[in-house]
Amino acid sequence: MSLMHWKIDFTEQADRELLSLDKPIRERIRKYVRDLEKLDNPRMRGEPLTGILSEFWKYRVGDYRLICRIQDDKLLILVVKIGHRSEVYKKRR
């Protein structure tokens, strides 16, 4: 049994993005996040991003992506963006 417990937190933007989704996908993402908290190492599920986004990790939930920053010193996974895979990486103007 693991002694480490990860905490998940959402930025205001990610929280708004989550609330804007249809209820079934919102619930699926919430379940995924609860499962992430139980892992010894959240990197076992996600994939590192590259280039200018290399400080972030992505998690796939169906056609949606969670973009996160993993803070090992705080055992925190900070969700910074949630969106459809076709839109989530686009820069807002």
Regions found by a protein language model. Give the residues of each.
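Surface-exposed, Lys/Arg-rich phosphate-binding patches that contact polyanionic backbones
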Residues: 13-24
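Short, well-structured alpha-helical segments
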Residues: 26, 30-34
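Residue-level signal for well-ordered alpha-helical positions
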Residues: 21, 32, 91-92
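Enriched for short, Lys/Arg-rich terminal
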Residues: 1-7, 16, 27, 61-64, ...
